[in-house]
């Protein structure tokens, strides 16, 4: 006997497919700094290699010059420790590491903003603060100074040492000239103050004696003697010539005797200079019309000093 099973012919509604709902990603937060829109960037810490090049310390700053020690690269001394910044000194020049020019090898630099893909969210002006952690740009080497520059030119080490050594009276004549040249270089070119030479008391005495000996004038025949004398006392020939010109009137006529006047013995009154430098009047009394030291006048009845007259 066959069983007839009733089949449910009712149309069934299709079961909804289980679909994963699409999640909307939230937009990246936009923060404002100083009123300017900025994006959040993922900071990639680049391991940049930092090297320290030539030393830029000015060893002549105290005298207004510019002198470098010539050290080409920083070499850490064996006693330097990274934990103690004060111990980071160069083994070659002895200067601290901060005096050396810092150079960064930035091989993985960020491309410029113009090469980045454009986005609708980057339409606003972008402020990138991640450049703050980068080291400052390296210092440029000192530029050559123009001739019209107001700052003094660099002074070489030999000139600088001679200028700082003081007034050495026993130094040779050539060294004294170098020291004088260094003093001229250390002065400001724009200043109008004239360089004046200062003499010691010993130099003044020797120059006075030498000027008396040659007659306070440098002659052609005295060239060798003047040159030897200048080398002995350490004074230039032109300086000695100017000193003799300025002091000949004050030293030449400040001696013991006054001006010598020839004595007049013919009866005419005249001036005479005695031994102690006091001017006096002298006459032998045999002439007339002159001034006499005695109370009586001459044969012609001339007046006398005491205002009394007599006739012979």
Curated annotation (Swiss-Prot):
Zinc finger (ZF-HD dimerization-type): 52-103
GO molecular function: DNA binding; protein homodimerization activity; transcription cis-regulatory region binding; zinc ion binding
Top-level division of the source organism's lineage: Eukaryota
Intracellular or extracellular location(s): Nucleus
Chief location: nucleus
Sites of Phosphoserine modification: 13, 273
DNA-binding region, residue range(s): 192-255
Record-annotated site: Required for DNA-binding: 244
Tissue expression summary: Mostly expressed in flowers, stems and inflorescence and, to a lower extent, in leaves and stems.
Gene3D superfamilies, A to Z: Homeodomain-like
Record's GO cellular component terms: nucleus
Comp. bias (Pro residues): 136-155
UniProt keyword Repeat present: no
InterPro entries: Homeodomain-like_sf (IPR009057), Homeodomain_ZF_HD (IPR006455), ZF_HD_homeobox_Cys/His_dimer (IPR006456)
Subunit structure: Homo- and heterodimer with other ZFHD proteins. Interacts with MIF3; this interaction prevents nuclear localization and DNA-binding to inhibit transcription regulation activity. Binds to ZHD1, ZHD2 and ZHD11.
Domain notes: The homeodomain differs form the typical one by having namely 4 instead of 3 extra amino acids inserted in the loop between helix 1 and helix 2.
Function, in words: Putative transcription factor.
Protein name, as recorded: Zinc-finger homeodomain protein 9
Species whose genome carries this gene: Arabidopsis thaliana (Mouse-ear cress)
């Amino acid at each position: 006997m066959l069983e007839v099973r009733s089949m449910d012919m009712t149309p069934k509604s299709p079961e909804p497919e289980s679909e994963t709902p699409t999640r909307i990603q939230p937009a990246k937060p936009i923060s404002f700094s100083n009123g300017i829109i900025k994006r959040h960037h993922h900071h990639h810490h680049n391991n940049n290699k930092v090297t320290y090049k030539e030393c830029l310390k000015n060893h002549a700053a105290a005298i207004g010059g510019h002198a470098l020690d010539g050290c080409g690269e920083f070499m850490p001394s064996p006693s330097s420790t990274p934990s103690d910044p004060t111990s980071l000194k160069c083994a070659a020049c002895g200067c601290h590491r901060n005096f050396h020019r810092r150079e960064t090898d930035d091989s993985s630099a960020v491309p410029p903003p113009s090469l980045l893909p454009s986005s609708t969210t980057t339409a606003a002006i972008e402020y990138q603060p991640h450049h703050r952690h980068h080291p400052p740009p390296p210092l440029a080497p000192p530029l050559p100074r123009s001739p019209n520059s107001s700052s003094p030119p660099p002074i070489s080490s030999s000139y600088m040492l001679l200028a700082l050594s003081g007034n050495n009276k026993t130094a040779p004549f050539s060294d004294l000239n170098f020291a004088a040249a260094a003093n001229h270089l250390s002065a400001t070119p724009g200043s109008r103050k004239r360089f004046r030479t200062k003499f010691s008391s010993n130099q003044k005495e020797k120059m006075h004696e030498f000027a008396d000996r040659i007659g306070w004038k440098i002659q052609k025949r005295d060239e060798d003697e003047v040159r030897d004398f200048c080398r002995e006392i350490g004074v230039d020939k032109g300086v000695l010539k100017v000193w003799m010109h300025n002091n000949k009137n004050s030293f030449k006529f400040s001696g013991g005797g006054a001006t010598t006047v020839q004595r007049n013995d013919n009866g005419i009154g005249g001036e005479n200079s005695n031994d102690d430098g006091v001017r006096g009047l002298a006459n032998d009394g045999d002439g007339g019309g002159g001034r006499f030291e005695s109370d009586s006048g001459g044969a012609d009845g001339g007046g006398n000093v005491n205002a009394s007259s007599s006739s012979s």
